[in-house]
């Protein structure tokens, strides 16, 4: 097999960086790495984790697999990683808001901050307010008016308790005094199935999950949680345009491992993933999916995790998320 000149340079640079690391970090990885995902296959976390796994595997010449361990809104996978050996071979790809909300709602057996070693942000998600293609609502205002008239209010589907989609939708409905009932699914794909068939009135899926259904008319977009309008949906307004800037939620997704991972190992893993994020195919796929690549230092990510935990403890009370 012939290596490209660019890849040779990347491998050489990575090799030189290893010389300054302690032995455990220098030897990493010597066997396959597992990326744990707490939601069902086909959702934004799963899809993007698999894209990263492919890019990382190509960069380091070692197998990287994705394992879906669903349950408790991602809590089962998070608890599994928290209890894993801090050797870098079992890592978690997760939503910052959901990771904090599940324990804030009393539905988890892990420590959202102290139980994990932050590595780096991976990507941001953009979510879009969608209704079935045959819904009478063509704007957010019309949807909310329907909810006020409908017995029991709107039915709201989410990809999981504490997901950005869940928090965003609930905050907007409460701010606009719209009655609603929430159904939580184990990921974006099962939620989308019920949204398309009209079993739920609306949801806030990610662009990557919903774009094909928007294109063929099975779903209709009413609003977008993004800094600016998205080119493929030029007529869909942003939340800022609609007057809901204060209801926006954090939408970062990140990579973490068990607490106790040596700093040099954390640094090595971070460098591997940042180098992999420069893969042209990965960049192309994430751009198409409306999930821009982002990165951070472990310290920056740690502060963000703490901020999310502080925020979600308050939101759990405001949104009545606390479970027995």
Q: Model-derived features: where do they sit?
A:
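C-terminal lobe and pocket-closing loops
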Residues: 124, 210-278, 307-310
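Short coil/turn segments
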Residues: 40-42, 96-97, 132-137, 158-163, ...
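Hinge/capping helix and adjacent helix->loop/strand transition within the periplasmic-binding protein
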Residues: 83-89, 103-190, 239, 252-285
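N-terminal (or domain-start) structured segment
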Residues: 25-114, 153, 177-206, 213, ...
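A ligand-binding cleft/hinge motif common to bilobed small-molecule-binding domains
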Residues: 97-107, 171-175, 202-236, 313
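Beta->alpha turn/N-cap motifs
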Residues: 93-98, 158, 188, 205-210, ...
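Bacterial N-terminal signal peptides
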Residues: 9-20
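An extracytoplasmic/periplasmic, membrane-proximal ligand-sensing/linker region
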Residues: 30-32, 174, 241, 263-324
């Amino acid at each position: 097999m012939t290596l490209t000149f660019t890849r040779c340079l990347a491998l050489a640079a990575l090799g030189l960086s290893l010389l300054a690391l302690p032995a455990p970090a220098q030897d990493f990885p010597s066997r396959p790495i597992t990326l744990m995902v707490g939601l069902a296959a086909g959702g934004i976390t799963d899809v993007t984790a698999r894209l990263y796994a492919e890019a990382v595997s190509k960069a380091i010449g070692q197998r990287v697999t994705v394992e879906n361990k669903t349950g408790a809104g991602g809590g089962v996978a998070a608890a599994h990683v928290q209890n894993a050996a801090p050797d870098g071979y079992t890592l978690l790809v997760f939503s910052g808001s959901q990771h904090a909300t599940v324990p804030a709602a009393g539905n988890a057996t892990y420590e959202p901050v102290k139980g994990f070693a932050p590595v780096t942000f991976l990507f941001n998600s953009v979510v879009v307010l969608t209704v079935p293609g045959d819904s009478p609502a063509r704007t957010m205002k019309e949807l909310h008016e329907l909810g006020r008239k409908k017995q029991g209010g709107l039915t709201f589907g989410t990809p999981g308790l504490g997901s950005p989609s869940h928090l965003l939708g609930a905050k907007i409905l409460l701010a606009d005094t719209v009655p609603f009932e929430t159904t939580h699914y184990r990921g974006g794909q099962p939620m989308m199935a019920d949204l398309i068939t009209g079993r739920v009135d609306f949801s806030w899926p990610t662009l990557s999950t919903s774009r094909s259904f928007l294109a063929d008319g099975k779903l209709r977009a009413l609003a977008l949680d993004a800094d600016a309008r998205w080119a493929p949906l030029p007529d869909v307004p942003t939340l800022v345009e609609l007057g809901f800037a204060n209801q926006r939620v954090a939408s970062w997704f990140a990579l973490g491992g068990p607490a106790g991972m040596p700093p040099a190992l954390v640094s090595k893993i971070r460098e591997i993933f940042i180098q992999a994020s420069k893969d042209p195919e990965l960049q192309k796929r994430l751009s198409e999916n409306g999930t821009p690549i982002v990165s951070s230092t472990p310290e920056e990510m740690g502060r963000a995790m703490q901020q999310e935990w502080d925020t979600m403890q308050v939101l759990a009370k405001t949104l009545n998320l606390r479970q027995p």
